[in-house]
From Swiss-Prot:
<comment type="subunit">
    <text>The LHC complex of chromophytic algae is composed of fucoxanthin, chlorophyll A and C bound non-covalently by fucoxanthin chlorophyll proteins (FCPs). The ratio of the pigments in LHC; fucoxanthin: chlorophyll C: chlorophyll A; (0.6-1): (0.1-0.3): (1).</text>
</comment>
<feature type="transmembrane region" description="Helical">
    <location>
        <begin position="174"/>
        <end position="196"/>
    </location>
</feature>
<comment type="function">
    <text>The light-harvesting complex (LHC) functions as a light receptor, it captures and delivers excitation energy to photosystems with which it is closely associated. Energy is transferred from the carotenoid and chlorophyll C (or B) to chlorophyll A and the photosynthetic reaction centers where it is used to synthesize ATP and reducing power.</text>
</comment>
<dbReference type="InterPro" id="IPR022796">
    <property type="entry name" value="Chloroa_b-bind"/>
</dbReference>
<protein>
    <recommendedName>
        <fullName>Fucoxanthin-chlorophyll a-c binding protein A, chloroplastic</fullName>
    </recommendedName>
</protein>
<feature type="transmembrane region" description="Helical">
    <location>
        <begin position="73"/>
        <end position="94"/>
    </location>
</feature>
<keyword id="KW-0472">Membrane</keyword>
<keyword id="KW-0604">Photosystem II</keyword>
<dbReference type="GO" id="GO:0009765">
    <property type="term" value="P:photosynthesis, light harvesting"/>
</dbReference>
<keyword id="KW-0793">Thylakoid</keyword>
<keyword id="KW-0934">Plastid</keyword>
<feature type="transmembrane region" description="Helical">
    <location>
        <begin position="114"/>
        <end position="134"/>
    </location>
</feature>
<keyword id="KW-0148">Chlorophyll</keyword>
<dbReference type="GO" id="GO:0030076">
    <property type="term" value="C:light-harvesting complex"/>
</dbReference>
<keyword id="KW-1133">Transmembrane helix</keyword>
<keyword id="KW-0812">Transmembrane</keyword>
<comment type="similarity">
    <text>Belongs to the fucoxanthin chlorophyll protein family.</text>
</comment>
Length: 196
């Protein structure tokens, strides 16, 4: 596990290395996405690796879809991690042999304590959501629009400005959650408690 944390830290080193700039890159292609949601203060438009320097809208939309999806997953992960750290557990047993939810440790240690059938159920549940529910709806209002006529929460009642504001908030909170869950995992491996 320490190797995984070390590898992720080593890989993140590239985020701080200067990106090579092509002499042929024009200002027009570099600024193709400067007015997109997410290109906001304090960084503005930021693409240090030049992933969409060619101005390809389809590629940008795919990367945005992945960013939103991972942000949503990480927001749930941070909430779940903090809930467990606060000592909140489901009542009862996790299996028929008497393993209680209370006996399952927090964080990475839970992977070895949860029965194999439980891990299989988690993977099947995630797979079902990936295939059936959390897919980008073709022709949706925006990239990452997972509305499927089951859950709406009144989205259509908002004004266009309010929708843009809420999408920007979600994007920023998703970015923060991606950094947050990584920080929580690193703190766990370092043996540092996150709660007083």
């Amino acid at each position: 596990m320490k190797f995984a944390v070390f590898a992720s830290l080593l890989a993140s080193r590239a985020a701080f290395a200067p990106a090579q700039q092509s002499a042929r890159t024009s200002v027009a292609t570099n600024m193709a996405f400067e007015n997109e949601i997410g290109a906001q203060q304090p960084l503005g438009y930021w693409d240090p690796l030049g992933l969409v320097a060619d101005g390809n809208q389809e590629k940008f939309d795919r990367l945005r879809y992945v960013e939103i999806k991972h942000g949503r997953i990480c927001m749930l992960a941070v909430a779940g991690y903090l809930t467990q750290e606060a000592g909140i557990r489901l009542p009862g047993d996790i299996d028929y042999s008497g393993t209680s939810f209370e006996s399952i440790p927090n964080g990475f240690a839970a992977l070895s304590a949860v029965p194999g059938a439980g891990i299989a159920q988690i993977i099947a549940f995630i797979g079902f959501f990936e295939i059936a529910v959390m897919k980008d709806i073709t022709g949706g209002e925006f990239v990452g629009d997972f509305r499927n006529n089951y859950l709406d929460f009144g989205w259509d009642t908002f004004s266009e400005d309010k929708k843009l504001q809420k999408r920007a908030i979600e994007l920023n909170q998703g970015r923060a959650a991606q950094m947050g869950i990584l920080a929580l995992m690193v703190h766990e491996q370092l043996g540092v408690s996150i709660l007083p």
